[in-house]
Amino acid sequence: NKATVHATVNEFWYVLEGRGEIWRDNGAESSITVLVPGTSIDIPAGTSFQYRNVSGVDLKFICIAMPPWPGDSEATFIKGIWEPTI
């Protein structure tokens, strides 16, 4: 996907199927986390992030956003570490 940063929304993910990676950068620390079934991660507001599928199986996860999504101006696309495929 395209690398993104949210202005006010925090996200929490729980991976259901597939295998992937997520890059997160909060300005002080940058990391890549492997996403496999059972993995839980958080993406605090203001954190740059980008994820990708690294298997032939769809990457499926539950995403909870808090507070509720305020509108189109919430997400800003940025330059990530991987070339987006969608």
Protein language model regions, located:
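Vicinal oxygen chelate
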Residues: 1-3, 9, 32
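Short beta-strand His + acidic residue motifs that chelate non-heme Fe in jelly-roll/DSBH
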Residues: 2-4, 22-23, 43, 49-56, ...
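Short, conserved beta-strand element in jelly-roll/cupin
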Residues: 5-22, 64
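A generic "binding-loop/recognition-motif" signal
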Residues: 8-9, 19, 28, 47-48, ...
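Flexible, glycine-rich phosphate/dinucleotide-binding loops
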Residues: 21, 29, 70
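Short acidic-glycine-tyrosine-enriched beta hairpin
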Residues: 26-45
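Double-stranded beta-helix
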Residues: 52-86
